[in-house]
Amino acid sequence: MKIYITGLPSGYEVEHLVRLFYPMAPLTLTPPEAGEDCVWAEKKPDGLWAMVRQGDKCAERSAPLPAPAEAGGETPEFSLASLTYDLLRQWTGIRPPWGKMTGVRPVRLIHDKRAAGWSETDIDHFFLERFDCSEQKYQMAKAIADLQEPILKVGSAPKTYSLYIGIPFCPSRCSYCSFVSCNLDRDRKMVQPYVDCLCNEVKEIRRQADKAGLTLCSIYIGGGTPTSLSADQLRQLMGTVRQNFDLSKVVEYTVEAGRPDCTDAEKLAVIKEYGATRISINPQTFSDEVLAGIGRKHSAQDILDCYAEARKAGHDDINMDLIAGLPGDTVESFEHSLRQAIALDPENITVHTLTLKRASRIVIEDQRENDYADVAAMLEKCRLLAEAGYRPYYLYRQKNTLQNLENVGWCKPGHEGYYNIYIMEEVQTILSAGAGGSTKLVADGGKRMQRIFNFKYPNEYIQRFAEVLERKKGVADFYDHDLGPKASG
């Protein structure tokens, strides 16, 4: 199946709506040949037209051009995308649970509509009728928006910010992963120089934040796998954070402990001693067979042992990640993983849906052995979380996620992950340290934004570190002027 779009300056919306039905269909720039399987969408001078062809069967739809936008009409691209969606929904018999919505932040959309003065009835119509969103997904997004409102008031206070620190090292690469990360065994010599640079960047961030008059709200150390650092390197990094920031005023300090094959009692003790208030231990699954298949070098028992060590070290706010749709997983084994996580009684459980990243081994080696019809059934099992007293508190979506589904953070009341909410709803500045870091500067209630990018790869980050520090001066400049300097990537 190929995608061919013509007559528009950009076919972005059409392409991504087609991929709700055919996730891996390539976009072609030349018209399909006669008899070739394809979805063809075209804006013609006198109207819109869409066609789908598979084998010897074909269907098509047409519609007049929309009224001009200034007269209240839709854009031609959205109208063509809607026409194509309606055709493919009838053709395949599939109703995507989020309908025509391709955006990654549906909860943010609810916040924006409320802020713009829309009535709840108008918002309901927007989601359910215009975008064909299912009642179940919309009600979940709406409940999350309600829960987030008081938390967003804290995070959206003028000149508040969160600090993100990235550790791009892992003991091994998971098959579903496309993030920039380095193999610890291969790149071990790079780790200490990287940590040294990272500590200096943290100090520069504090200086720039002070110049701009910013107040730190939350801290998140993520990866990669932060516990791929040694205990001494964690002390060095977290000690630098403690020396440069008043942690007593921080509402949340998260460290992704991540994988049990590099997280031990000493590291867990260091993380607690140096001020972290929340950690994440991420099993992804409790099936040994699935763990082996995705390239994890540990067992389900290792996860249980790591969790017990974390509790022993005094960690009282723990998140656990699970992924629905991993190769080799089934509805039954996913339910087992979910029940196992609930039995451990962590404060947070985050359920991700597998995303098909083109740079991941799953896609490169075509390991997509699930037919994905079971993925929605896996997520239906999340009712077990609600029954156990957890409630959804943040939600986001990604391109090429199986069945156009979502990632949802669940928590016990009072244990919402503040940083997760702030970064997803884009209400505050995020100052990022480390390779691949993307600093996002926010002012005027989100009306003005700017990004400053760090170099993507750790070796380049180290070699060109002077440029990293120079770019950070754009933080204070952004708040001193109407427009900050542009940052090249």
Can you name each region flagged by the protein language model?
Residues 1-108, 112-116, 120, 413-489:
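Radical SAM enzyme core and accessory elements
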Residues 35-36, 355, 359-433:
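A C-terminal junction/extension of Radical SAM enzymes
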Residues 50-52, 165, 279-281:
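Short beta-strand motif preference
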Residues 88-95, 115-163:
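N-terminal [4Fe-4S]-dependent radical SAM core
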Residues 166, 280, 348-352, 421, ...:
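Beta-strand scaffold of nucleotide-dependent catalytic cores
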Residues 181-380:
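Conserved non-cysteine loop/helix-boundary elements of the Radical SAM core domain that shape
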Residues 214-215, 219-223, 233, 401-407, ...:
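Amphipathic, soluble alpha/beta structural segments
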